[in-house]
A protein has these predicted regions:
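A short glycine-enriched loop-to-beta-strand structural element that forms part of the catalytic core
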Residues: 48, 82-131, 143-149
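Flexible, glycine/charge-rich interdomain/linker segments that couple
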Residues: 135-170
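Conserved long alpha-helical elements within nucleotide-processing catalytic cores of c-di-GMP signaling
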Residues: 10-34, 47-51, 55, 61-68, ...
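Short secondary-structure junctions
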Residues: 36-41
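Conserved metal-coordinating catalytic motifs of nucleotidyl cyclase and c-di-GMP turnover enzymes
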Residues: 2-5, 51
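Short helix/loop segment flanking the catalytic signature motif in cyclic-nucleotide metabolism enzymes
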Residues: 53-88, 121
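Conserved short hydrophobic interaction patches
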Residues: 31, 35, 73, 77, ...
Length: 172
């Protein structure tokens, strides 16, 4: 599962307006769909879960190539959504929530990838995917990040301690 989100989208939406913001969301959806069709298989699926959040469901052997294609394409395509001045500067100068004017990077695509190997809950999937997406968003630019923990639903081996505890006869 790949959880995709747009970085710096609020600043773009506030600066360029909701209509242009909707175009950026549509651009992201189109690029993710293209990457899924180009690098995935017939079982791959894309879902828009709201706002600027998307979920791709694909086989592990496809999801990295899909994410790589999507982030590369989005990096090129998003530049066309900015005025010449912002595009050349590589950022947008806008007033933040704190009332201070500052420079914000262009919108970028961050993707967190998790793997599922067996039964698990939707809560576990959502929490882990959100955690890895947050990690991806902490890096600058258009990036994807894999969860390095064991896949969700995988059975972790339980250590076996042979002769670790004496039998009652041995203890006596």
């Amino acid at each position: 599962i790949a959880y995709a989100d747009l970085d710096n989208f609020k600043v773009y939406n506030d600066t360029y307006g909701f209509k242009n913001g909707d175009r950026v969301i549509k651009l992201a959806a189109d690029i993710l769909d293209w990457a899924m069709r180009k690098r995935g298989d017939a079982a791959s699926r894309l879902f828009h879960i709201g706002g600027d959040d998307f979920v791709l469901i694909a086989k592990p052997e496809h999801v990295e190539r899909m994410s790589q294609a999507a982030t590369r394409c989005f990096k090129r395509a998003i530049r066309g959504c900015y005025c010449t001045q912002d595009r050349e500067r590589g950022s947008v100068v806008a007033t933040g929530r704190d009332g201070v004017e500052r420079s914000y990077p262009l919108v970028s695509l961050s993707i967190g990838i998790i793997e599922i190997a067996g039964p698990c809950t939707l809560m576990e999937i959502g929490e882990r995917a959100a955690h890895v997406k947050k990690y991806a968003k902490s890096m600058p630019g258009n990036v994807f990040a894999w969860d390095r923990r064991p896949p969700l639903g995988s059975v972790q081996p339980v250590p076996v301690f042979i002769n670790a505890c004496p039998t009652p006869e041995e203890a006596a």
